[in-house]
């Protein structure tokens, strides 16, 4: 067992369930909550306790990790009826692993501080497969001492941990990373479409690309699945669109103009309107292919 061995997870979707699985298999005591209880109940077989509210998760935990849809959901589980702050006790810390606007994150952290609860923002790069293997990249914002006191927990789920500074820093970096990913998926989709239009094999395109300086994790790992039409989701197109909304909102808050982010947002929205929202985000290839024909 660990000295800080009681962990709570609020939000047991694909990523939350994978993080929970990793922590359970690493010997932590885990209490979980999800608004749709069935998604939390499936973790019982691995030894998790299922709570009836965020308040009950907080009461049972040293560290509560929130992995929910957006800032509004973070607010609700934090400060709403039977929220985390209602379960406050000495030593409780919250780590938000959602993807939200860094400005909102700072505001939420301030509310937590006023309630006497330290909050870290701890968004991650990587999906469920990386979470279960402890290979996430964790980006941390918040009080450094609080982070260092809980670093062993983050080391359990992540192979690389970056402490970035004040609250909101982790979420700002996460948005920059997801903007990069959304663009890579689009550019790879257009390149595959161009190659096919020229009557060439996309497999050869990928082999050439991955033989050069310009290869990426996406071209190596996602590219072969894309050309086979395998869009089983690890992160849905609809979720990427939600993050692009957040990216554009953050840019506005920072008084920045990001024209490619705006264009990407529109393209992903158009793909959703074409019924592709539940595909993996790389399913944007389906939309690019369809709309490329004149």
Residue ranges and their predicted role:
Residues 169-292:
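Helical "substrate-binding/catalytic lid" subdomain
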Residues 19-20, 39, 108, 153, ...:
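Hydrophobic residues within alpha-helices
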Residues 36, 70, 143:
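Residues in the short beta-alpha loop(s) of Rossmann-like NAD(P)-binding domains
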Residues 54-59, 63, 71-136:
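Rossmann-like NAD(P)(H) cofactor-binding subdomain of soluble oxidoreductases
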Residues 1-66, 92, 97-98, 128:
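NAD(P)+-binding Rossmann beta1-loop-alpha1 motif at the extreme N-terminus of oxidoreductases
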Residues 100-178:
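Rossmann-fold dinucleotide-binding core
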Residues 30, 50, 119-120, 161, ...:
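Hydrophobic beta-strand scaffold residues
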